[in-house]
From Swiss-Prot:
Acts as a transcription factor that recognizes and binds to the sequence 5'-[GA]TTA[CT]GTAA[CT]-3', a sequence present in many promoters. Involved in the development of the excretory duct cell, by positively modulating embryonic transcription of putative transcription factor lin-48, acting in concert with cell death specification protein ces-2. Negatively modulates expression of key autophagy-related genes, bec-1/ATG6 and lgg-1/ATG8, and may link together autophagy and apoptosis during development. Residues 19-38, 181-211, 305-317 have a biased composition (Low complexity). Residues 89-96 are annotated as: Leucine-zipper 1. This is Transcription factor atf-2. Residues 364-378 are annotated as: Leucine-zipper 2. Residues 60-85 are annotated as: Basic motif 1. CDD domains: bZIP_HLF, bZIP_NFIL3. Residues 361-388 form a coiled coil. Interacts with cell death specification protein ces-2. Its main location: nucleus. It comes from Caenorhabditis elegans.
Length: 401
C-alpha cells in the first residue's frame, strides 16, 4: 500500500482523495435520510389534509352562493309579477272611477212641465177604458219627482253634480222597490267611489291602527318603534243615495277602509329609515375597532348569503373555529352581531313590503268589484227614472192636448 501510494503521482493521489470524499458524503446523506424516516411524509399528509379542507370549504361556499342566487332571482320574478298585477289593477280602478264619474246620460226628448203645475182632479169617465185608464190622478200625485220638484233638481241633474253638493232627498214611502234596493245597496258602504283623491283634505284625518305596515312594525320584534313614520291618510266617504223613507242605520253597515295611493312614499320612508333593534344595545367596540361605518344591507342580498359571508371571511376560518366564540376577539364578535342585526332588519323590511303588496292587491280587487256593481246599479236606476219620466210626459200630453 505504501509502495503504491509512493509510486503514484501527486495528481493521481488528489483524484483518489476526491472520489473517497464524495463516496463518504453520499453515504452520510443516505444514512441521515434513513434515520429521519417518516417526518417528511407526515408533513406532506398534513398539507394535503389542509388542502382538502379548503376545497370542502370553497365547495360549500359555492353551493351556498348558487342557492342564494337562485333565491334572489325567484324573489325578483315574484316582485315583478306582483308589481305588474298592481299596475293593472290600479289602471282598471282609475278607468272604472272615470266611467262612474262621467257616465253619459242622454237628455230626454220630451218637454218637462213647469214646476208650479197643479194637476186638477180628473173624472174617471174622462178617458176610455184602456191602458190610460189605469193611470189615476191620485196615483200621479205620489210620484216623488212631482212632489219634490220645487225643492230639488231632477235625478238627471243629480247624476251630473259633484258628490259634495248632492243633498239626498227623502222620498215618500210609496217608492218603487227597485229604487229601494238600489238605495239600500248604496247605503251599505260608507266609502263612495265618487270622491277623488284630495291630499289637502285627507291630511286632516289620520289613518286608524289597522294599517298593514303599522301592524308589521308593531308585530315584528326586529324593528324599532321609535321612528316617526308618516301615517297614511284616510278620506271620509259618503253614500250617493241614502235609504228611502228612513236614515241609514249606523250599526248595520261595516266601514270599508280603502287604501290611499301613497304606497311609494310609505315604502320609501319605511326602507330609508335606519331602524336599530331595541333588544340589542349599541356596539361598544365600534370606535375601538374602526367598524363604525353603517351596515350596507339591501333587499337584493339574501339572508343565507349575508350570514355565510359574515361567518366565513377566509378559508382558514372553518365552521369548527366559528362555533367557539371564546377564542375570538371582541371586534369579530361585534361584527358578527351587527351583521346579524342587519340581516334581521332586511328580513323585516322584505316581509313588510310583501304583505303591503298583497294587501293592496286585495283592496284593489275588492274596490274594482264594488265599482262594477255601482255602475250596473246606476244604469238600472237611470233606466227606471227614464221610464218614470216617459210616463209623466204621456200623462201631461194627455191632460193638455
Amino acid at each position: 500500500m505504501d509502495v503504491d501510494s509512493a509510486s503514484l503521482s501527486p495528481s493521481s493521489r488528489l483524484s483518489v482523495v476526491c472520489s473517497a470524499s464524495a463516496e463518504f458524503s453520499s453515504s452520510s446523506s443516505d444514512s441521515s435520510n434513513f434515520s429521519e424516516g417518516s417526518p417528511p411524509e407526515s408533513r406532506r399528509n398534513s398539507v394535503n389534509e389542509s388542502v382538502i379542507k379548503d376545497e370542502h370549504y370553497w365547495e360549500r361556499r359555492r353551493r351556498n352562493n348558487d342557492a342564494s342566487r337562485r333565491s334572489r332571482e325567484k324573489r325578483r320574478q315574484n316582485d315583478l309579477a306582483m308589481e305588474e298585477k298592481i299596475m293593472l289593477l290600479s289602471a282598471e280602478n282609475e278607468r272604472l272611477k272615470s266611467q262612474l264619474g262621467t257616465t253619459p246620460i242622454p237628455q230626454p226628448s220630451v218637454t218637462e212641465p213647469p214646476t208650479s203645475l197643479i194637476i186638477p182632479q180628473v173624472a174617471k169617465n174622462l178617458f176610455p177604458a184602456g191602458p190610460i185608464a189605469s193611470l189615476q190622478a191620485s196615483s200621479m200625485l205620489t210620484v216623488p219627482l212631482l212632489q219634490a220638484a220645487s225643492h230639488i233638481p231632477s235625478m238627471l241633474q243629480l247624476c251630473q253634480l259633484q258628490p259634495t253638493t248632492i243633498q239626498s232627498p227623502v222620498y215618500a214611502s210609496t217608492q218603487q222597490p227597485a229604487s229601494t234596493s238600489a238605495s239600500s245597496l248604496f247605503s251599505s258602504s260608507s266609502s263612495s267611489a265618487f270622491h277623488p283623491f284630495r291630499p289637502s283634505e285627507s291630511a286632516q284625518q289620520s289613518f286608524p291602527s289597522s294599517s298593514v305596515i303599522v301592524k308589521i312594525e308593531r308585530r315584528s320584534p326586529d324593528s324599532s318603534t321609535d321612528v316617526n313614520m308618516p301615517q297614511p291618510q284616510l278620506q271620509p266617504g259618503s253614500s250617493v243615495i241614502q235609504q228611502i223613507g228612513q236614515p241609514a242605520p249606523s250599526g248595520t253597515p261595516q266601514p270599508v277602509i280603502q287604501a290611499v295611493q301613497q304606497g311609494p312614499s310609505l315604502l320609501s320612508a319605511l326602507l330609508s329609515q335606519r331602524r336599530p333593534s331595541p333588544t340589542v344595545p349599541q356596539s361598544r367596540t365600534e370606535h375601538i375597532s374602526g367598524l363604525n361605518s353603517p351596515p350596507r344591507h339591501t333587499g337584493n342580498k339574501s339572508d343565507c348569503e349575508s350570514v355565510s359571508s359574515s361567518a366565513s371571511f377566509s378559508p382558514s376560518h372553518s365552521s369548527e373555529d366559528h362555533s367557539n366564540y371564546s377564542n375570538k376577539s371582541p371586534q369579530y364578535v361585534d361584527r358578527r352581531r351587527r351583521n346579524n342585526e342587519a340581516a334581521k332588519r332586511c328580513r323585516a323590511n322584505r316581509r313588510a313590503v310583501f304583505e303591503y303588496r298583497s294587501r293592496r292587491v286585495q283592496l284593489l280587487e275588492g274596490e274594482n268589484e264594488d265599482l262594477r256593481t255601482q255602475i250596473e246599479t246606476l244604469k238600472a236606476e237611470i233606466a227606471h227614472f227614464k221610464s218614470v219620466l216617459a210616463q209623466r210626459a204621456s200623462v201631461v200630453t194627455a191632460l193638455h192636448p
